[in-house]
């Protein structure tokens, strides 16, 4: 959130303590020292009349109580995938598919390195061919912005395919 928000983002980042032992799996990230404990909020203007309000929340099951509220009115979602921990992302993808909310998958590249090729991730996670998969570095403003732009493009395309009778309304509201 901090890499792309044009306002000072509201964040709930906290130092990890002994209380997280046995709760958070740090096997793939043994040097991790902070974690999001609730949600983040930010804003990004893609155009003078197209403003995105950004909400980010951890993927762990214990945070799901807020997911239904966060997706109400959403145009779509980015499932940010740490390729070192693919198994952690299945439930997030299921969540958005069950709610018929357009989503894209963002493969978070740490230090410009992917652990798996895009097609390998698509196959391993059974992501439909029409769902975009982008590579990004969530710490980099331009990379994150391009991922959000791709989400907006996909969400508009997704909506128009399912609601062709409202195409004029969609372009008029932009």
Where do the language-model regions lie?
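Canonical P-loop GTPase G-domain recognition
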Residues: 111-168, 174
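Conserved protein kinase catalytic core
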Residues: 8, 62, 88, 114-115, ...
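Conserved C-terminal guanine-recognition region of P-loop GTPase G domains, centered on the G4
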Residues: 80-130
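Residues at the C-termini of beta-strands that transition into short coil/loop
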Residues: 13, 58, 137
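Conserved NTP-handling cores and scaffolds of large molecular machines
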Residues: 4-11, 100, 155, 159
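Short, glycine/charged-enriched secondary-structure capping and boundary segments
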Residues: 2, 68-70, 92-96, 118-122, ...
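Conserved G1/Walker A P-loop phosphate-binding module
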Residues: 1-29, 33-35, 42-53
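Switch II of P-loop NTPase G domains
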Residues: 33-43, 47-95
